[in-house]
Amino acid sequence: TEKYRGILGDAVDYVTVEHIDKDLKALGHKIDLWHTTDQLFIARRHAKGMINLLTVHDLNFLHEKKGIHRIKNLLKLKWFIKRSDCITVISEYVKQDLLKHVNIGKKPLRVIYNGIQDTTKEAQRQPDFVNVNDKFFFTIGQTRKKKNFHLLIPMMKYFPEYKLFICGKRRTSYYRELKEIKEHCHVDNVEMVGEITNEERNWMYAHSEAFLFPSRLEGFGLPVLEAMRYNCKVFSSQCTSLPEICKNHATYFDSFEPEKMAKTIKEGLAEWDKNGELALAAKEYSMSYNYDKYMKQYIELYKELLHSLN
């Protein structure tokens, strides 16, 4: 349906349909391989002689949900895997998490990292909420508790000369919680600015003093790599997939205690030069996550799976 348009990025062409089974049958073609590119997607096909490939992005529900909701999501994933012939995951972390909680039997399981669109040559626009002389830190993501944005608010007491802009949806309970924490901490240099456009996001990456990402649950960690492409210093948690994705191109928080987080940032910024070797190395590393490599790996896998039909 139209609501999924753009979900895989701007580099993909989209065809909007309302009734996938009906529309696919109308094409009159035999489908040899069906790739469900996200375990959350509703669109699925099963037929005799058809190979089913499933991509699992994360098992975050195991850590976010409780009781019957947790069990329901796990059973659903197990059922999808049972009906799949091959599984891909987006990081080694997700692979190990999957193997820990789901018996996949002898089904092939492969890690294929996400490709990332290069936006560095795309349009940029300074957001209205940023003043000309502002020195600022930046973070962006789903406004959910797993992102740990609340840890950054008391830390900003140690950076009176900087602002922190938290970008993400306003209509969540966690957003309201962030506002309450800000009021309780009496911090006036933190702004929750809501969602921003792609052009504004690009500008923020390019002009931020640092990108802060204390998330505790990630299957991959797209924003950290996006930030690196703009020579932006990245500070990250050591949770889940982030050390695997950032490697030595980020500085990691050893503690979530505000003063220690601030110390980590100050030390990291002291050795950072946007045009220096560390920044250029991080950018080059980030560029290795591209759609050419991503598509090449999937095309090779498609050929391998289709060859097994013959």
Regions flagged by a language model, labelled:
Residues 1-310:
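Carbohydrate transferase catalytic cores enriched for Leloir-type hexosyltransferases
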